Structures are given as C-alpha cells and as structure tokens.
Amino acid sequence: MSPEIPRLLRTGMHGAVATGVMSVVFAVARRRGAMPGKTPPRRIVAAVWPTAPRRSHAALAVALHLGIGVGAAIGYRIMFRGAAGSPISAAARGIAHGLATWAVGYCVVVPATGALSVAPRDRRDRQGMLLLAHAVYGATLGLLEHHVAERAGRR
C-alpha cells in the first residue's frame, strides 16, 4: 500500500472534524435567526432526490455534508502537501481553501442543483454565514494538518 493512503485517510478525518466545527457555526447562526429555513445540504437533498422519503432527508444531508467536507480536505492535501510555515500560514492556507470551496459550491455546484440561487443573488445574511462557516472549516483543517505534520516532523 502506498504510504500516501494513510495520510489521505487522516486528512479525510480532519475534513470530517472541520465539517463538524463548521456545523457548530451553522447551529449558532440558525439559533440567532441568521440561517432561516432548511440548511443548504437539506435543500440540495430535496432538489436532487425529490423522491427520497422525507424522514431520510436529515441523514442524507449530514452524509452529503460530511462527504463534501472529506472530499474538499483531500483536495487540500493534494494542493498543499509539504507546505511549510507557521500555524498562522497554515490557517491562512486553510481559510483560502475554505473560501475557494464556498465559491465553487455556491457560485457553481449548488445553483446547478436548483437548491439555491447563485451566491450574489442569494440572501446576503445566508451567504455571509456560509462564508464565515467555510473560513472556519478551512482554518480548522489547515491547523489540524499543520499540527500532524509538525508532530511527524514532515513539513
């Protein structure tokens, strides 16, 4: 087995953790009224699979969101493998990656599903929270990857 496989799996786990942290931002935003209605993953499930039983929408949305977070993290690993620097530079790389993930998702992919409008035409409060949440995702991912690389002595 390639030595890169365990590293990619670890990065995938970091993506799942970062997605969980991002979901806390969503939960706080929803409690404060900044994200009314269904979450974007639930909207995507409803748009892409309208015949899915309603009771399964929540589980499908969680699986979708985790899958995207894991996949985006692996993309991060491929782009920034071996990048050196401080925790601040790792967080900055992560934030840039998180915002790029938001741009691809909310300016191209999600609108293509019919779940939401293109980001500039969507609600500003929702897109502001989505930007913040994706920045948090990226910072978390970047710091996790940096921490593990430092501990392993591989930068």
Set out the residue ranges of the language-model regions.
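Short amphipathic, positively biased membrane-proximal segments
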Residues: 1-155
